[in-house]
Amino acid sequence: MQTFQADLAIVGAGGAGLRAAIAAAQANPNAKIALISKVYPMRSHTVAAEGGSAAVAQDHDSFEYHFHDTVAGGDWLCEQDVVDYFVHHCPTEMTQLELWGCPWSRRPDGSVNVRRFGGMKIERTWFAADKTGFHMLHTLFQTSLQFPQIQRFDEHFVLDILVDDGHVRGLVAMNMMEGTLVQIRANAVVMATGGAGRVYRYNTNGGIVTGDGMGMALSHGVPLRDMEFVQYHPTGLPGSGILMTEGCRGEGGILVNKNGYRYLQDYGMSPETPLGEPKNKYMELGPRDKVSQAFWHEWRKGNTISTPRGDVVYLDLRHLGEKKLHERLPFICELAKAYVGVDPVKEPIPVRPTAHYTMGGIETDQNCETRIKGLFAVGECSSVGLHGANRLGSNSLAELVVFGRLAGEQATERAATAGNGNEAAIEAQAAGVEQRLKDLVNQDGGENWAKIRDEMGLAMEEGCGIYRTPELMQKTIDKLAELQERFKRVRITDTSSVFNTDLLYTIELGHGLNVAECMAHSAMARKESRGAHQRLDEGCTERDDVNFLKHTLAFRDADGTTRLEYSDVKITTLPPAKRVYGGEADAADKAEAANKKEKANG
């Protein structure tokens, strides 16, 4: 096994990983940085993000407003000190991206244009047409090329991290092009591996978003926090799950049922102004959890449209006009034509909620470090405490760069101060990783990874979807336990050493099953409804701050069982309150403004 010596290793070369690498290189120009990715960096899932990235940019906006929208959107499960750090650093990172070449969309006067996104009361989403993730990732990638100390290991699949006496010491990866193993030694490792959306059958995620980093951290005793909170995006294409960005609704797109009725006005998102008034375009911009839940209720009422790929509602953009659609949403027009045969200029787009984002992830502190010294996590694979029970659209792209920078700087500092590990123990661990790989390759049985993965996805849709019941969650838990046993009998039929996807998909499935069990067990134990976790059973349909204003921590014990613990939520300035949107929120804002004015005059 070849060994590469580095100071810092970063797993994942998407937005978070690249930003961490750049920050590390700037923090210590002499540091040797290994950047490992199972795909070429520009194929990372960040490229699929369409809508935009949040940052205060207007005079009538403020850090306080961004903070409030994020905490309320997360149903008060956010770490408020983390949110405060985030909102104050977003504008700096957006400006930095512009200086590096990110082509933010502009107003006629040359200023940066911003959209309104769901759950945000003010336009603060920076965007580059509807290809924001692509442009951000391209900008970060080309910037990273300026730093020769960043050595890329493209198309390398990380098998496991190496830990000695509570401190990370590197990792073992497989060169997918050759089938050989490489040991990368480093006194700090940053996990930037993305979420776990592929544990669901229908999702908006790329094929690489399989929960690898979460699974590796979990196997070393690091808990996964708040895994019951999985966001369904309201507007995915039926069948494929391809995302119709929230930017569509930010530009004024509307959602209608089979009767052409804008049904969101029936679910607490109706505007204060009558239908048809200009302000009414924001009715569709409620938080994603509530908009997805409204679809479920429309389906129960029989107001959705049946198709061979499932029930849908319509996303209508026709009133925006051809010019605006081709200027602001060109990629959406391409996708709709290619995947559902619809020209958005002429007809509405069929959409349905689709699993989209993992709010939970690897537990970290406010500096992105886990319980293992030197092991950091950032981006969707992590739970730094930003999103709570429901993420607001456009906060995730901003999270990648704000906390990517922080993780890179903190990891560089940790690597510089770490002492030497036990060489014999580290080598023994690396040999153990190699042996487990051989055992998997030689495993005999009649099971197929693809069938198990398919059954896992369907089980998660059924038991851990938009609305949940104890019966369906228990059914999912039982099914996952069965699949874990069957996984032990998976047979690798491909014996090649070059791009053995049969082997790689099997390894991904192993991580996915472990992560899915954390999701299901965490959901069953949270006997309330909060954010993206909604229950239908009696006594659990409302938020319960007395018993469940706390984080769920899921551990995987040595015998393979999932064990749950809980930790407190850090509340600094904004105590829990009712979440209100639409006209109710407008009325509350007016009352607050009047109260402030009265106090000022009194």
What are these regions (language model features)?
Residues 39-69, 75, 231, 245-246:
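Conserved N-terminal glycine-rich FAD pyrophosphate-binding loop of Rossmann-like flavoproteins
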Residues 188-242, 307, 387, 393-410:
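Glycine-rich loop(s) and the adjacent beta-strand/alpha-helix scaffold that form part
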Residues 93, 98-180, 185, 192, ...:
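Conserved redox-cofactor binding core of oxidoreductases
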Residues 3-6, 178-188, 371-374:
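Core beta-strand elements of the Rossmann-like FAD/NAD(P) dinucleotide-binding domain
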Residues 77-83, 94-110, 223-226, 304-308, ...:
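A short alpha-helix-loop-beta-strand transition element characteristic
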Residues 41, 216, 222-342, 410, ...:
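An anion/pyrophosphate-binding glycine-rich loop and adjacent beta-alpha core
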Residues 78-91, 125-142, 153, 203-211, ...:
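Short beta-strand to alpha-helix junction loop
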Residues 4-6, 15, 23, 29-35, ...:
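Glycine- and aromatic-enriched mobile tails/lids
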